[in-house]
Regions:
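Hydrophobic N-terminal alpha-helices or hydrophobic patches in metabolic proteins across all domains
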Residues: 1-107
Length: 107
């Protein structure tokens, strides 16, 4: 999946609040990749990095996969095709939500 170009439908834009956990504010755009099913039986979730404005959809490259060791699903990290990003930058960007999980980042 790494390196693949995908379209993400953003259902939780930058600055929005988690629908079930009101203390979680999305510091990045977050959504799903239509027609790609994840381990939880829902469409594949994705963080969008490298874009600092709220979006409704985005097409970009899968630059990393966040494996949740203590959960049944992985999260994709999607970014503009030419963006160079480190594991540390990804960890910092997704910490607002991934801090509750034991994760490993594949790049």
């Amino acid at each position: 999946m790494l390196g693949k170009i995908v379209k993400v439908v953003v259902d939780r834009p930058l600055g929005s609040v988690h629908p079930n956990h009101k203390d979680i504010v999305y510091t990045v755009n977050y959504g799903y990749v239509p027609k790609i099913m994840a381990g939880d039986g829902e469409e594949q979730d994705a963080y969008i990095l490298g874009v600092d404005v709220p979006l409704s959809e985005f097409t970009g490259k899968v630059v990393a996969v966040i494996h949740r060791k203590n959960d049944i699903e992985d999260k994709w990290v999607v970014a503009p095709e030419n963006l160079v990003i480190s594991k540390e930058e990804i960890l910092e960007a997704v910490h607002f939500q991934e801090q509750y999980f034991d994760i490993e980042i594949e790049m």
